[in-house]
Amino acid sequence: MQDRHGLKNITTSIQKFAEVVVESKPCKMVFVRRKNKQAQMMVAELSPPMSVENTQLNQKQKINTKETNIRGCSLLPDGIESFQIGKDKTGSSTYDTVYIKDDNSVAVSSGGGGKGCITIIDIESQKVMTTIRMDTCINGMAVRGGTIYYCTTDNRLKMLNLSDKSVSDIISSSMSGLDYVATSGDKLYCTNYGTRTVTCCDLHGTTQWEFKGERVLQGPLGISVDNYGNVYVAGYISNNVVVISPDVQRHRQLLSSKDVFSYPIVLDYDKSTNRLLVVNYMGTAFMFDVTKGEYEKSRTLYINK
């Protein structure tokens, strides 16, 4: 790959619109009759959580963005998908985009010449709300409350307080090749393209686990987390999307090149609609409904040791 991930530079940014469907399923009720017929017992069979074993993707939409080098994507309210292209109109390199729910805005990371910035854009007016200058270029970002967590090109993990614009180190020592970051609860999840690893740490930077599944995941880039803590990762070199369990003990390939897929770069999981957006190198975006289904024997489940 060339230019860090072998990606070209494009100078536009687009938005696409899609219908959002929200499904709600009640728990299953089961009646059990005792053999002596003296009593009836009603049992509520609680629906099991979404797991690596029962996660099922159903493709709902295919979007041709007519662009390549999409470096970030976000699922926004009202069925809007936001895609971030490799360069903006000023010629600065852009990398990622994330949705900020608190003020209905998006944050875009960009930069060049060793300097970077995070630009906050109001979704309704599509006008820039604020631009925050940084002393280093920025890769992937994630939002939790009023804080943006981000990876830097000098391989550090930092946090930006949106209230006072202060910046703090989460991991101050240099880490090799951090690319994208996701957050869920009190955990952060980072991909490392160079070492082919996914790392989970707490909000203070203490490593909880590291996943290195070379058999199934190579060149990890985009990353996102569902409501149950399952971690979805785009494998650029391995041509697939892999889901990793919250305890890192199990993982499974959900999508491969056989699923009309080639070189996935970024993805985003919408926890409110249980939808997964995946974008590949050629600029094709795929929208999936994520549901609980029967375990597919054709999909290999790996147990990590």
Show which residues each predicted segment covers.
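Protein-protein interaction scaffold domains that mediate dimerization/oligomerization
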Residues: 1-60, 74-76, 179, 249, ...
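A short beta-strand motif characteristic of beta-propeller blades
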Residues: 58-64, 83-90, 126-133, 165-173, ...
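Beta-rich, blade/repeat-based domains predominating
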Residues: 67-76, 90-105, 134-152, 173-194, ...
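Short loop/turn segments immediately following the C-termini of beta-strands
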Residues: 111-113, 153-154, 193, 236, ...
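Structural signal for beta-propeller blades
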Residues: 115-118, 156-158, 196-198, 239-242, ...
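Short loop/turn segments that connect beta-strands within beta-propeller blades
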Residues: 122-126, 161-165, 202-206, 245-249, ...
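Loop/turn-rich, solvent-exposed surfaces of beta-rich toroidal or solenoidal domains
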Residues: 191, 195-200, 208-246
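Blade-level signature of beta-propeller repeat domains, shared across WD40, Kelch, NHL, RCC1
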Residues: 262-305
